[in-house]
UniProtKB/Swiss-Prot annotation:
InterPro entries: DegT/StrS_aminotransferase, PseC, PyrdxlP-dep_Trfase, PyrdxlP-dep_Trfase_major, PyrdxlP-dep_Trfase_small. It comes from Methanocaldococcus jannaschii (strain ATCC 43067 / DSM 2661 / JAL-1 / JCM 10045 / NBRC 100440) (Methanococcus jannaschii). NCBIfam families: PseC. Pfam families: DegT_DnrJ_EryC1. The lineage of its organism: Archaea, Methanobacteriati, Methanobacteriota, Methanomada group, Methanococci. This is Uncharacterized protein MJ1066.
């Protein structure tokens, strides 16, 4: 066995600063959405370089409210990738629109921009590019298609905090961008999300929709500055962030780039150790992007090894190395097959990657010894299965 203790696929990186800020919030008696939420939004807006940043309880909420704010509705179509988490497709369905999947590029595992135009119909209203693992999509091509066909671009950046495309931070390119602060993400608030946009009208609509459709700043009604009177001006949702979550986010954001760089260091070691090893396929990184390295997706070349991906994961677990898989393509799930008629074989590239992908541990709390343990475990399994 390579190591004695189990190395989990992820661990959140929470410091004393976050803990002390949460304690301060709890002692303040203001624990729901309030001043610290607004502070976190301001810090995030400045970090990304967007005009507006609206905090929410998840990235899913951000994607959903983006669709609502842009009036995506019944019988509309939204183009996205099948190689993503369920949230990306589900929010489209919540609007009674149809998710139209486009297969992925076999190098970056992002949506294949060369196939997008073929999927456009008179019902198409938006494109949701997903920056898989933290590698930005080809946004210039996507924006050109969107301009040519008068479509919105709603970026799913759940994996991509800190990523850049041709020198532009992800979060400053599309009509809206949604980020995730789930426990496994590059920064965390436990649960949480943020939408960025440069469009004031969209920003104001999302702010109202996130809290039941109550008129703006109604959260202040419980403070000395507020009034008991409010009006419901939209049929909104309960999607707001709390000051407890924001307290964590304030300090997570301050070290976001330090944590991204540690992820990058780990990815570099993996790449150097695995890229010339027969039986493995390492991630491709385009020269014009800065990778966020939320995931390290290693592909097992099942044509060169006597072991499949599932068995490889089991062998890693025997060596006390935890892993995950990202993702089961959406078109293979029962709901999407039954509701939209998708079937196995519809998106061969997504299926090809899925059958081979293993997400190796990559997070700031990993020590160099942890990283070497992963490397040695992978090499051991490869050598035993040639």
């Amino acid at each position: 066995m390579i190591r004695e203790s189990f190395l989990p696929p992820f661990r959140p990186c929470i410091g004393e600063e976050e803990i002390n800020e949460v304690i301060d919030t709890l002692k303040s008696d203001w624990i729901t959405m309030g001043p610290k939420t607004l502070k976190f939004e301001e810090l995030f807006r400045n970090y990304i370089g967007s005009k507006f940043a609206i905090s929410l309880n998840s990235c899913t909420a951000g994607l959903h409210l983006s669709l609502v704010a842009l009036n995506i509705k019944d019988k509309d179509e939204v183009i996205t990738t099948p190689y993503t988490f369920a949230a990306t497709g589900n929010v489209i369905v919540h609007q009674r629109a149809k998710p139209v999947f486009v297969d992925i590029d076999k190098e970056t595992y992002n949506i294949n921009v060369e196939e997008i135009e073929n999927a456009i119909t008179e019902r198409t209203k938006a494109i949701i590019p997903v920056h898989y693992a933290g590698h930005p999509c080809e946004m210039d091509e996507i924006l050109k298609i969107a301009r040519d066909y008068d479509l919105y671009v709603i970026e799913d950046a759940a994996h991509a905090l800190g990523a850049e495309y041709k020198g532009k931070k992800i979060g400053t390119i599309g009509d809206t961008t949604s980020f995730s602060f789930y426990a496994t993400k590059n920064i965390t608030t436990g649960e949480g999300g943020m939408v960025t946009t440069d469009n004031e009208e969209i920003a104001e609509k999302i702010k109202i929709l996130r809290l039941h459709g109550i008129s703006r700043d109604a959260w202040k009604r419980y403070s000395s500055e507020g009034s008991w009177y409010y009006e419901i001006i939209e049929c909104g949702y309960k999607y707001n962030m709390t000051d407890i979550q924001a307290s964590i986010g304030i300090h997570q954001l301050k070290k976001a780039e330090i944590m991204r760089k540690r992820r990058e260091e780990i990815a570099k070691i993996y790449n150097e150790e695995f890229e010339n090893l027969e039986g493995l396929i390492t991630p491709t990184i385009k020269k014009h992007v800065k990778h966020a390295w939320h995931l390290y997706p290693l592909l097992i070349n099942i044509d060169r090894l006597k072991i499949n991906r599932t068995k490889f994961i089991e062998e890693l677990k025997k060596q006390n190395i935890g892993t995950s898989v990202h993702f089961i393509p959406l078109h293979l799930h029962p709901f999407y097959r039954k509701t939209f008629g998708y079937k196995k074989g519809d998106f061969p590239n997504a299926e090809w990657v899925y059958e081979r992908e293993i997400s190796l541990p990559i997070y700031p709390k990993m020590t160099d010894d942890d990283v070497i343990d992963v490397v040695n475990a992978v090499k051991k399994i490869v050598s035993e299965n040639r």
